C-alpha cells in the first residue's frame, strides 16, 4: 500500500507522527499485517497506485468477515515545482467493528531556487462512516533544503484522526490535539547524516503536554 504510493509531500521530518503528511489512514501507513500493491508511473508525471493490507482472525483468513481488510488507491501528479495527490482507503473494523472510508488531499510547492523561500507541503484527510461523527486530520510543513550545511524544517499538524468532539454526558473525549516540530538534518561525512528534532505534542485536558528531543542517525554505504 503506502510503500508504493507517491503522496505529494516534500517534507522530510523524521518523527513518526507528522511524517505521513496528514494522510496516514488513507495511505494505509499503519498496515494490518499482510500487504500487496501495484503502481504505474506515466511519463507525464501522473502516477496511479492501488494497495491492500489485511490481517486474518484466529479462526479465519484474509478477506473474510472475521478479519480486518483495507483497500485503497492513489492518484498523484508531480513536477519539479509542484504536485498534488488524492488518496482513498476503505478500512474495515476501524474502531469497535465500525468501518470507515478515508479521503485525503495533499499538495506541495517548491521554489525555483533554494534560499530564503522554503518548500511548502500540506495535507488534509477526512474519514466518514454511517451513523458516526466524521474524523479529520491535517498537516502543514515548511522546509529549507539549503540552510547552511544542511536542511531545516518545521511542521504542525494533528496527532491523528480526530472528531474534535468532547461530550462529557456521552463519554466522548476526542479533542483536536496538535504536534509542533522542528528538525535540522546535516551530513557528517559521505556516509553518515545526523538529524536532531525537537517537538511538542498536546495531550488531553488535565495532562501536561509532551516536549522532547530525538536524534536520528542515517548511514549509507
Task: List PLM regions with ranges.
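Outer-membrane beta-barrel "beta-signal"
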Residues: 186, 209-221
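C-terminal closing repeat unit and adjoining cap/tail of repeat-based domains
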Residues: 180-198
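Short active-site-adjacent structural elements
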Residues: 7-9, 162-165, 192, 202-207
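Detector for outer-membrane/organellar transmembrane beta-barrel domains
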Residues: 66-70, 75-179
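Outer-membrane beta-barrel proteins
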Residues: 24-26, 63, 95, 130, ...
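Transmembrane beta-strands of outer-membrane beta-barrel proteins
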Residues: 1-2, 49-53, 85-89, 108, ...
Amino acid at each position: 500500500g503506502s510503500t508504493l504510493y507517491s503522496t505529494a509531500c516534500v517534507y522530510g521530518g523524521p518523527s513518526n507522527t507528522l511524517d505521513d503528511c496528514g494522510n496516514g489512514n488513507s495511505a494505509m501507513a499503519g498496515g494490518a499485517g499482510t500487504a500487496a500493491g501495484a503502481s504505474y508511473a506515466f511519463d507525464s508525471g501522473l502516477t496511479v497506485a492501488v494497495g491492500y493490507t489485511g490481517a486474518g482472525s484466529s479462526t479465519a483468513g484474509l478477506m473474510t468477515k472475521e478479519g480486518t481488510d483495507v483497500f485503497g488507491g492513489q492518484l498523484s501528479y508531480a513536477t519539479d515545482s509542484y504536485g498534488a495527490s488524492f488518496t482513498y482507503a476503505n478500512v474495515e473494523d476501524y474502531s469497535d467493528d465500525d468501518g470507515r472510508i478515508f479521503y485525503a488531499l495533499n499538495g506541495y510547492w517548491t521554489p525555483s531556487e533554494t534560499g530564503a523561500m522554503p518548500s511548502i507541503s500540506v495535507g488534509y484527510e477526512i474519514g466518514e462512516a454511517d451513523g458516526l461523527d466524521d474524523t479529520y486530520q491535517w498537516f502543514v510543513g515548511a522546509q529549507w533544503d539549503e540552510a547552511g550545511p544542511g536542511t531545516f524544517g518545521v511542521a504542525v499538524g494533528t496527532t491523528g484522526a480526530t472528531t474534535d468532539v468532547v461530550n462529557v454526558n456521552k463519554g466522548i473525549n476526542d479533542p483536536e490535539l496538535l504536534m509542533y516540530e522542528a528538525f535540522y538534518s546535516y551530513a557528517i561525512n559521505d556516509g553518515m547524516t545526523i538529524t536532531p528534532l525537537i517537538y511538542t505534542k498536546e495531550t488531553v485536558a488535565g495532562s501536561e503536554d509532551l516536549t522532547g528531543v530525538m536524534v536520528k542517525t542515517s548511514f549509507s554505504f
